[in-house]
């Protein structure tokens, strides 16, 4: 897994961090992020990161002092591994992602049109950002 991380105290400072991928647990899926947009709106997410909770959506890896974060982006991804009976490998989705190459989510509230990420750290965050549209 590789992430583009931003220093929370100075949005002009970024770094690329990589580590081995995490294991996919029961009911989880691995999404390969294909493309995303990064606009002035995303910079606003960084500026308001602590106030509104944007830094909490996608915790930065290898970040023991919590000084780095992942500014969320909107984009497209493909399901490359699925341990969830309701989601098939090869499906494509649109939603909220970290600026990274992969993301593990735990689909809940699955419908033919969409699902939400049920990962525990995202449950207190605004639900609209936890929703993924199935394409």
At which residue positions do the language-model features occur?
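Generic detector of short, locally flexible boundary/turn motifs and exposed helical patches
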Residues: 1, 42-46, 69
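Short, Gly/Pro- and small/polar-rich lid/capping loops
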Residues: 1-8
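Residue-level detector of solvent-exposed, low-hydrophobicity positions
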Residues: 11, 43-45, 61-65, 109-110, ...
């Amino acid at each position: 897994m590789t992430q583009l991380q931003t220093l929370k105290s100075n949005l002009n400072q970024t770094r690329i961090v990589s580590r081995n991928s995490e294991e996919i647990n029961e009911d989880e899926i691995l999404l390969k992020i294909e493309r995303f947009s990064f606009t002035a709106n995303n910079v606003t997410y960084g500026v308001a990161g602590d106030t509104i909770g944007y830094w909490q959506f996608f915790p930065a890896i290898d970040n023991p002092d919590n000084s780095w974060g992942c500014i969320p982006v909107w984009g497209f991804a493909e399901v490359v591994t699925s341990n969830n009976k309701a989601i098939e490998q090869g499906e494509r989705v649109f939603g909220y992602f970290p600026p990274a190459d992969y993301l593990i989510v735990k689909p809940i509230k699955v419908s033919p049109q969409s699902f939400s990420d049920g990962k525990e750290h995202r449950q207190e965050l605004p639900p609209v950002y936890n929703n993924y549209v199935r394409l």
